[in-house]
Amino acid sequence: MSQSINLYKQLANHKLFKKTINFNLRRIKLVLQKLNHPEKKLNNVINFLGSSGKFSTLHSVKCFIEANKQKATAYISPSLKDIKERFWMGHRYLKHQEIKQSIKIIEKLKVPLTIFEVLTVIYIMNASKQNVKYHLVEAGALFAKDSTNVFNFPLAQVVVNINKQHLNFLDKNKNTLDEVVYQKIGFLSNFTNIYVGKQKPSVLRKIEKYLKKNKSNIVYSNSWKLIKKGNQYFYKDKKNKIKLITKVIHSKGLLENLCHAIKIALDLKIKKKIIEKTIPKISFEGRFQYLDKGKIKKKLKKHEKIMLDGAHAETDAKNLVNYLKAIMLPKYGIWAMMKNKEPDLFIKQFKNMFRKLITVPIKNEQSSMTSKELYNIALKNKFNVEKANNFNEALKKISSKEKKTIVIFGSLYLIGEVLSKN
């Protein structure tokens, strides 16, 4: 863990690399040119872009590919516990030493990249050396000038739910949902397979508008359904009906992402039987995840449950609320959030959900909101709220012999901190 923190600190404190976000493909393309275009060695690239659901959709596709006895590299962001998690090489994660060596090579090129661009180059350099069938690449914010938009002929581009996240990255005069959709959809390849996940009708209309002249094969989410019979969910399309047997995927939103991945897997010629056998094994760390063991779980009283969810946008919040409504136990929340989100809109979704809410900062994250800032927002929205200096203090304020569910939410960075402590 300390090696991971040191690598992040090395990047954050590096004079050449910028911590601020600055969208521009010129820098990364120059670096890739100097490295003799390793990105061109990546065959069967599948991009995952959008606002909510990139990781769960990518991870599900990866699980299906591996169950089919094929290999895929994967690039994700953010990592939860360790920088290594960003770089899956088909059979293992990159070692800390390999990441360090890659940074040294990039340094020598003397191109002033952003930290996310450096991480993307590290992935491309190392993925280009792997003998695998697919390369699964999660985009950062937006897509038009995102550092992952450097592959000329991707096999597929997967669009997950698009919402108001990333408005803060747009110019003030273009700070609209329509512009978010344009930045993500208007720059997709004309020579690929585009998969569009479940969207609000208003967002779907915008997507259809920007894809009207796109020559790619476009697969919309009306080609499949998530259906429920009794307490059981199923994936259904014109040819297939697949039972979604899972004990750990709790929300409708995550099940829709799983269905989206099933459609992609079927189109990759992965057999229905393999998909059915794989579904029970799929879990999403930090997404609707209960802690059943570990150091934090041991601190709790016998009748206390604790769950984590990295929800940090309005759509995520609604998804989490729909799940929490079905829980009859009293619910207590521990909330943290990054500065570039919409905390007021986010927390409004949880009205009357928690008996008490505790706000906390995120450890080692300068861009996190303070517990006082979040406390004031929650107070304004009439929550029963207290603030704490850290997660451990928040847990002490809540933990008691009362039966309850403790929900930790608001940021994947907070979830990563908690998982590391556990």
Q: Which positions does each model-derived feature cover?
A:
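N-terminal leader/targeting and accessory segments in enzymes
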Residues: 1-71, 80-81, 97, 111, ...
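ATP-dependent carboxylate-amine ligase catalytic core
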Residues: 25, 32-33, 38-43, 67-152, ...
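Nucleotide phosphate-binding/pyrophosphate-handling subdomain across enzymes
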Residues: 44, 134, 145-158, 163-165, ...
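Hydrophobic alpha-helical packing residues
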Residues: 61-66, 127, 350, 378, ...
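Short internal beta-strands
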Residues: 75, 193-199, 334-335, 355-363
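Acidic, Mg2+-coordinating active-site environments of NTP-dependent enzymes
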Residues: 130-138, 154-277
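C-terminal helical cap/extension that packs against the catalytic core
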Residues: 200-209, 213-215, 302-306, 347-405
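Active-site-proximal loop/hinge segments that shape catalytic or ion-binding/gating pockets
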Residues: 411
